[in-house]
Structures are given as structure tokens and as C-alpha cells.
Regions:
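Residues forming the flavin
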Residues: 1-51, 58-156, 160-526
Length: 526
């Protein structure tokens, strides 16, 4: 196969147009191309009067002479090589069933290791009902919510699959998702997403594959303790929601609990498991009319059916040394209640596959360093998050209504009394207020500077009626659970801290890749 990159395709261009351009680049007749596969497709909107796609394709054709063109290369077929290991006397245990745990369990199952999975939250079918109930009534289930349950926090985020990782295992993740029913376009879109409406079905299909290969998945079952003897993992104590605790023996434990498993972090600390503070970011969600973002990004081409809703990714560096950036941008989406602890309020963003909602939203975040925590305790960052979430809960009215403020009012430091053109999407409801009442001064001041600077990059970003919804604290884990080159804990042999919660990933793909890497080490370990 021959790979051709940087082919320009007009917005109304067809596969036949792509084929003709590929043939032209190869200096052959189009009919000589036996097959053409789209490998990557992205939008080039740098010139607003010429918005188009940039494509990479693989073609199969006879070629007498290879063109001297750096954009034409031999395509290397990807094939994931499953590690070969021996069956063990004790089955490996996976704790957590988000992206890291899901793919760790899948690889273990495909390798014949018959993993046993424990997830504190519910299966995705019941989880969706629990989350919908919380959004409607404000009645939180601390064990099953936007953070906990099958699929992890990413299930209610848009299913964004874009990643900075260059690890080839990312292709394995995408192929497994497509095999589980996700849209095939995630294999080639530059910014792939499955959508909150479609991701649950794909997650369920992967779970069913794990079960068919001899694995077990226990939902509504929390791990209360890790048993360690002579610096070796010997088992876990688990507590089903409606049954007595029991112990499971294992000498291989993948801990993939996500960034919000705060009781697990406290348990690890009590066991003396080495961990350290980690930088993260906090801020709020910002909502604009999606049509405004479309016009700012695509100009006269805004609304073109082949473009869909526009996104953005912005970052600025302030004179005070802080970084401010947008994160987890959700075109045509909603701001959602993402709390997992009573008395604490958290926001997140999500959108369905069609991305056809009226508003665009993204987190606008300020970098937070360990010196901001006010304590050297390894969990000080987690306690910092809790303080912000408690303040947001208080300011919102102590009923999971979120504090909101118009951008114009936020910039002027005056409370919002009435909302403007942008209608909030957050449920169960919102409370107009002054966000300075629930954000640290350095965060609020940095956000104000950031919004004005970002408006220079994206026209309309500082729109007065744009809406800020607080507080966003779960952009990444506040701790890193230390591990060695074999991916095992520095203290406990057989304990594999994994994924975003352990501080080694950020997002669905990188977490899933880390889950695969940990599973490989479990399989190959002596």
C-alpha cells in the first residue's frame, strides 16, 4: 500500500475526487487504483475564504516508479501483537472499569488470563438511569454517577478520542471501539469522537467480549482494601452494595480507579503506597452560542453540512506565570453536573454524536501547582479540589444548582442578576451569582485575563452574554501513584497503578493505552 498525505479536498468533494487527486499525485490513471482507504481527515480553516479538508489516503495500485515526493511513502499496516503468557494459579484482578480498566481487562481476556473486574458503579444501562435521575432531581448517588460506573467519566463527556500520544496501541483502541459498534470515522478523523449517546453501546459490547472470553465483571462492588504481605500483593477486600464484604486472592492487581476515587487515594496513603502531589487545573465551563463559534471558525462556510459544529482549542500564558487554556471542548453540547461526593459540586461537558445543541461549551482552566495547595501532604491537591467544590455547592444554594455568571459581569466583577441570550444547559438548575465567591482569587483573576486574551484568537470569546458555570476541578488526577519501569508500585510487587487516576494518562485514549500497557506487564511478568 502507498500512503499519500496532504491531499486537499473541497467541502463538497467526493471519494471519486479523492481518487483522482491521488492518481494525479502518483502520475497514473485513476482506473489503475484498485482500492483507496481514508487514513486521516481534518479541517483546514486557516483561510476563512477557503475552508477545506486535508486528507491522507492509502492506495493499492501498480507503480512502476515511486514518485520523489516526501508526502508519498510506503504505508505500514498496523497489527497489534497480543503478548503470550502462561495461565496463573491466581486470576488477575482489575479495579475500575473506565477506559484504563476496560482495556486492561480486554487484553487480559484476549490473552486467556480470565480477569476479575470490580467496579464500584453500575453497568452502563443502569448508570444512565441513575445519572438522569440526579440531573432531574438533584439526588446524588455517590457510588454511581458521572464519575463512577461502567465506562468511567469519559462515558458522559462526548467520547472524545483525540490524543497527543504517539503510542501505536492507540490504533488498537480505536479498532476495538469500531468493532464494538462505534462509528468507523473515528479511524480517520483528526478529532474523533463517539458521542455520549453512542459510547455506552460500545462499552457494553467490549464488556460482553470480556465475559465471553472467561472474564468476570462485578458491578456495584467497591474495593475497600488491598492486602499486602512482605511487599507483595496477596488479595483485595471487596464490598458489594447489598452484600457482606469478602476477600479475593490475587498476586496481580491493576488499579484503574479514575481521577475521582478519593477514598481509594486515602486508602493507598494509609497503606504507605508511595505517591506524590501532581499539578492539575481548575476553573469553570464557558458556554457560547454554537452558531457564533461556527462563524468565528468557518466564516461564510459556517453551517455547511459536511463541516458540522466547529470546535476550538485555546491557550495563553499570563505575565503572572500562570497558564490558562480551554479543555474538553464540546460543540453543540451541554454542561453537566458531575459531582461524586455529597455536598460538593463539579461540572463537566458532553455532547452527542450529532453535536447539534444550541450551545458550545468548554472548560476554561488555570494551572494549579503543588505550592498552591498550602500543604506538603501527598493528598493536599485532592483536599484543595474538595474545598472549591464545597464552596461551589454553598454558593449554588446547596441543592446541586450550579453557580453561573455572565462573562461581562465576571469581567466587571459584579454579580449576575439576570441571564442574557445564552441559556444555561446545566441541570438540575443554576444560580446567578458572583463566581469570585467560589473561586480562589488567583484563579478568577487569571481567568479574566485569559478570556480577554483568548478573544484576540477567537472573535467573540469574551461575548458579554456568554455564560460561566462553576466549578471545574476534575481535569486530571491530583496525585501520581509512583511506579517503576515494570509499571508496578515501588512498594508492593503485583500492584499496577494505572490510567488517569494514578497520574499516567489524560483522556480516553491515553488511559486505554496505559491499561493495555499494564495488562501486557501482567501477562509477561514472571
Amino acid at each position: 500500500m502507498i500512503r499519500i498525505s496532504e491531499i486537499q479536498l473541497q467541502l463538497d468533494g467526493t471519494e471519486e475526487d479523492l481518487k483522482k487527486q491521488a492518481a494525479s499525485r502518483l502520475k497514473i490513471a485513476p482506473e489503475k487504483i484498485r482500492s483507496l482507504t481514508l487514513v486521516k481527515k481534518s479541517v483546514d480553516a486557516r483561510k476563512k475564504d477557503n475552508v477545506h479538508f486535508i486528507c491522507t489516503v492509502d492506495v493499492d495500485c501498480p507503480l512502476e516508479r515511486f514518485p520523489k515526493d516526501s508526502k508519498i511513502t510506503q504505508a505500514e499496516a498496523y497489527h497489534y501483537a497480543l503478548p503470550q503468557g502462561k495461565p496463573r494459579a491466581l486470576r488477575p484482578v482489575v479495579v475500575g472499569f473506565g477506559p484504563a480498566g476496560l482495556f486492561a481487562a480486554l487484553i487480559l481476556a484476549q490473552a486467556g488470563q480470565r480477569p476479575v473486574v470490580f467496579e464500584r458503579g453500575s453497568a452502563v444501562e443502569n448508570r444512565q438511569k441513575q445519572v438522569a435521575h440526579f440531573w432531574k432531581t438533584g439526588a446524588l448517588n455517590p457510588a454511581c454517577n458521572v464519575q463512577f460506573g461502567e465506562g468511567g467519566a469519559g462515558t458522559f463527556s462526548d467520547g472524545k478520542l483525540n490524543t497527543g500520544t504517539k503510542d501505536s496501541r492507540a490504533r488498537k483502541v480505536l479498532e476495538e471501539f469500531v468493532g464494538a459498534g462505534a462509528p468507523a470515522e473515528i479511524l480517520y478523523m483528526a478529532k474523533p469522537h463517539i458521542g455520549t449517546d453512542r459510547l455506552p453501546g460500545a462499552v457494553k459490547a467490549i464488556r460482553e467480549q470480556i465475559l465471553s472470553l472467561g472474564g468476570e465483571v462485578h458491578f456495584d462492588t467497591a474495593v475497600q482494601n488491598i492486602l499486602i504481605k512482605d511487599e507483595n500483593v496477596t488479595g483485595v477486600e471487596v464490598k458489594p452494595q447489598d452484600a457482606a464484604p469478602y476477600t479475593v486472592a490475587t498476586d496481580r492487581l491493576i488499579l484503574a480507579v479514575g481521577h475521582s476515587a478519593r477514598d481509594t487515594f486515602e486508602m493507598l496513603y494509609s497503606l504507605g503506597i508511595p505517591m506524590e502531589q501532581k499539578p492539575f487545573s481548575v476553573g469553570a465551563r464557558i458556554e457560547h452560542p454554537q452558531c457564533m463559534i461556527d462563524r468565528a471558525q468557518y466564516g461564510k462556510f459556517a453551517g455547511h453540512p459536511n463541516l458540522g459544529a466547529a470546535d476550538y482549542k485555546l491557550a495563553v500564558h499570563l505575565e503572572n506565570g500562570r497558564g490558562v487554556y480551554t479543555f474538553c471542548m464540546c460543540p453543540g453540547g451541554s454542561v453537566v453536573a458531575a459531582a461524586s461526593e455529597p455536598g460538593r459540586l463539579v461540572t463537566n461537558g458532553m455532547s452527542n454524536f450529532a453535536r447539534n445543541g444550541e450551545n458550545a461549551n468548554a472548560a476554561i482552566l488555570v494551572g494549579v501547582e503543588p505550592q498552591d495547595f498550602g500543604d506538603e501532604h501527598p493528598l493536599a491537591g485532592m483536599y484543595f479540589q474538595r474545598r472549591l467544590e464545597s464552596e461551589a455547592f454553598r454558593v449554588g444554594g446547596e441543592n446541586y444548582f450550579a453557580p453561573v455568571q455572565r462573562v461581562e459581569d465576571f469581567l466587571k466583577r459584579v454579580p449576575t442578576k439576570l441571564l442574557g441570550d445564552v441559556k444555561p444547559t446545566y441541570l438540575p438548575g443554576v444560580t446567578p451569582c458572583n463566581l469570585d465567591d467560589c473561586l480562589p482569587d488567583f484563579v478568577a483573576d487569571s481567568m479574566r485575563q485569559g478570556i480577554l486574551l483568548m478573544n484576540r484568537k477567537l472573535n467573540g470569546f469574551s461575548y458579554g452574554d456568554a455564560l460561566l458555570t462553576a466549578v471545574e476541578t476534575r481535569s486530571s488526577s491530583p496525585v501520581r501513584v509512583l511506579r517503576g519501569e515494570n509499571l508496578q508500585s515501588l512498594l508492593a510487587k503485583g500492584l499496577f497503578p494505572c490510567g488517569e487516576g494514578a497520574g499516567y494518562a489524560g483522556g480516553i485514549i491515553s488511559a486505554a493505552v496505559d491499561g493495555i500497557k499494564c495488562a501486557e506487564q501482567v501477562i509477561l511478568a514472571p
